Regions:
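Phosphate/pyrophosphate-binding active-site segments
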Residues: 12-109
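Short, conserved loop/helix-junction motifs that constitute active-site signature segments
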Residues: 9-18, 170-174
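Acidic-glycine-rich active-site phosphate/pyrophosphate-binding loop
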Residues: 104-122
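Thiamine diphosphate
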Residues: 116-192
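Short glycine-rich anion-binding loops that position phosphate/pyrophosphate groups of nucleotides
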Residues: 1-5, 26, 106-108, 158, ...
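Short His-Asn-centered micro-motif
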Residues: 1, 23, 103-104, 127, ...
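Generic structural signal for well-ordered alpha-helical scaffold segments
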Residues: 89-92, 113, 141-144
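Short helix/loop capping segments that flank catalytic or ligand/cofactor-binding pockets
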Residues: 5-10, 30-33, 50, 111-113, ...
Length: 192
């Protein structure tokens, strides 16, 4: 699909010299690193049905073991403390079945990316906005209205303050909505 939002994955892909396969429904080529690639214009689920997974290769065992080690290490470090890292790490515990997750500030998006393993296929939305903090409550309400599914929204304190008027939009949401406001002093964006 399109470009990843993860800074670490984008850095890895920028330096990667191997073969790229891109499965993208759109005809538009998104290739910021100008790598040679094989493109498949198809819906991802159609392509996956036509191309069953390859058997696990021996070289994959080491990264899988490292991944398990990292998951255990993160659990030990984050543990039961109540802070941004623990909320990001344990976020899957509050996700409703057949719901949607909305992540609404850049620091928390990065923490979820680094510290948690979300259920496979669980829909996740985010919106950076023009300034990175505007319109996030409105976006979460719009997702709830459009999808007609339960929504869990994680939004930073400054982002919430900038969009308080959009709370009125939630009167049009028919499914349960949980809004977590992360009190993190603006995610330290003003400390630079």
């Amino acid at each position: 699909g399109s470009r990843f939002i993860s800074k670490r994955i984008n850095q890895f892909l920028a330096e990667f010299q191997g073969e790229f396969w891109v499965v993208e429904q759109s005809q538009n080529a998104v290739d910021p690193n100008h790598h040679t690639q094989t493109r498949f214009n198809a819906k991802a689920h159609h392509w996956l049905r036509a191309h069953p997974p390859l058997r696990q290769k021996p070289w994959l065992l080491e990264p899988l073991a490292l991944s398990k080690f990292c998951a255990t290490f993160i659990e030990q470090q984050v543990g039961g403390n109540l802070n941004e890292a623990s909320l990001a790490h344990h976020i899957e515990r509050v996700l409703p079945y057949n719901g949607i997750l909305f992540l609404g500030n850049s620091l928390f998006v990065r923490l979820v990316d680094a510290l948690t393993k979300l259920p496979e296929g669980y829909p996740i939305y985010t919106n950076r906005g023009a300034s990175g903090i505007d319109g996030l409550l409105a976006t979460a309400a719009g997702i709830g209205i459009g999808a007609d599914q339960p929504v869990v929204a994680m939004i930073g304190d400054t982002s919430t303050l900038y969009d308080l008027n959009s709370l009125a939009l939630f009167k049009n949401v028919t499914q349960p909505t949980i809004i977590f406001v992360i009190n993190n002093n603006g995610g330290a964006i003003f400390d630079m």
